[in-house]
Each structure stands twice: as structure tokens, then as C-alpha cells.
UniProtKB/Swiss-Prot annotation:
It comes from the Bacteria. Belongs to the FlgH family. A lipid is attached at residue 24 (S-diacylglycerol cysteine). GO terms for molecular function: cytoskeletal motor activity. Assembles around the rod to form the L-ring and probably protects the motor/basal body from shearing forces during rotation. It is a lipid-anchor. This is Flagellar L-ring protein. PANTHER family: FLAGELLAR L-RING PROTEIN (PTHR34933:SF3).
């Protein structure tokens, strides 16, 4: 009974150890777009009958559209279609060369002139010299380039109207194909004057744009590194 308890305890300790190293090896993904990905317009305000043509007591005009009002979105819950046109390329290169040379010469007197023939050796030159020379060369070269392109359409909703009239928008699109799901999330700040008559706006005209593309499915699992490989990669000295 005692042996069985010790064996079970070893199994528990092993399981705890494996879970610990797995959590250390995993990399937490932080999404760019956080919070709710849609916005719902508030309830329609009750109509105020005050005997005038213009209902000035209604602070916002949900539920009706004045004849001469700009039809572009400007209220919470309004929808806008964003044309994704992201094409970013960057490259850099660096070359460095360093060289250093040094030399030294030292002259030493072997013996005084009176002791020149004591050992039966005649030193024609009663001095010797020590020469030292060193050289250090370094050459390095590196280059890096990246090219990213993202095109498509996504319809977003107005989440908040800023004090200056700009619109904070957010949206998400999900597409499921063959047991795999793809997500496109978007958020940013739009100037309503940049929205065209067809209710479209280019992503290049949106400030603080955050575009996120994710996929969940078999292909996504294949692209992930196993926890043991991550752990070995972290502790590997090379």
C-alpha cells in the first residue's frame, strides 16, 4: 500500500512538472483589437411634440433622417465599409569594416663591452631586438527586407463619436471553410469627410488602424510549434 502511494505521488509530481514547463514554454498571444467588435445604437428617443417644425429637444436624431442632412454615417451603430488596401514594404542594409594594425620594437643590451669575450664568444653586435606586430580586422554586412500586402472588404460599425466629430469604428468578419475559421478584426478612427458617397473609405485614410487576421483550424495547428520544442529552444545554448 505504501509503495502504491509513493508511486502515485511520483506520477503527480511528474504531471505537475510537465504542466509547469509547458506553461513556461508557451507564448501568450495578445490580440490587437480588444473588446466588443460591434456597436448597437441606443434606443430611439421618443418624439417630442412642442409645436415646432424642428424638434430641438431631441439631442440626437435616431429614427428619422432630415431631408437636407448629410447621409454619411455619424451616429453610434452606423455602418461603414472599409476597403483594405495595405501594401507595406521596408528594407535596410548595413556594411561595416574595421581594421587595426600595431607594431613595436625594443632594443636590449646583452652584456657590457668588458664581458664581451669572457665566454669565448665575440658578439659583433652587443644588442638584441624584440619585434612585436599585431593586426585585427573585422568585416560585417547585413540586410533585411519585408513586404506585406492585405486587400479586402470589411464593414464596421461606429462605436463612439469623438468630441471633434471623428468616428471610432470597430468590426469583425468570420468565415468558416472546411472546419476552419478565419477572423478579420478591424478598429480605427475615421474622419467622416473621407467617406465617399457609396459609404466606402480606404484603410489608408483611417487613423490608428489596427488590422488583425487570424485562423483557427487544422492549418493553424500545423503552424504552431509544440510545447516541448519551445522549451528546448528556450534552454538551448546555441
Amino acid at each position: 500500500m505504501i509503495k502504491l502511494f509513493i508511486c502515485q505521488k511520483k506520477y503527480y509530481l511528474t504531471a505537475i512538472f510537465l504542466l509547469t514547463i509547458q506553461s513556461c514554454a508557451s507564448v501568450e498571444y495578445k490580440p490587437l483589437v480588444t473588446g466588443a467588435t460591434t456597436a448597437i445604437a441606443p434606443n430611439i428617443w421618443p418624439k417630442v411634440v412642442n409645436g415646432s417644425l424642428f424638434q430641438e429637444k431631441i439631442p440626437i436624431n435616431y429614427g428619422y433622417q432630415p431631408l437636407f442632412e448629410d447621409h454619411r454615417p455619424h451616429n453610434i451603430g452606423d455602418t461603414i465599409t472599409v476597403v483594405l488596401q495595405e501594401n507595406i514594404s521596408a528594407s535596410n542594409s548595413s556594411i561595416s569594416n574595421m581594421s587595426r594594425d600595431g607594431s613595436a620594437n625594443f632594443g636590449l643590451k646583452i652584456a657590457p663591452g668588458q664581458l664581451n669575450n669572457i665566454l669565448g664568444v665575440n658578439f659583433q653586435d652587443n644588442t638584441t631586438s624584440l619585434d612585436s606586430f599585431g593586426r585585427n580586422n573585422f568585416s560585417g554586412k547585413g540586410s533585411n527586407s519585408a513586404n506585406n500586402k492585405f486587400t479586402g472588404l470589411i464593414t464596421v460599425t461606429v462605436k463612439r463619436v469623438l468630441p471633434n466629430g471623428n468616428l471610432k469604428v470597430i468590426g469583425e468578419k468570420q468565415v468558416s471553410i472546411n472546419k476552419g475559421t478565419e477572423f478579420i478584426r478591424f478598429s480605427g478612427v475615421i474622419n467622416p469627410t473621407n467617406i465617399n458617397k457609396n459609404n466606402f473609405i480606404s484603410s489608408t485614410q483611417i487613423a490608428d488602424a489596427r488590422i488583425e487576421y487570424l485562423s483557427h483550424g487544422g492549418l493553424d495547428d500545423v503552424q504552431k510549434m509544440g510545447w516541448l520544442q519551445k522549451l528546448l529552444l528556450k534552454i538551448s545554448p546555441i
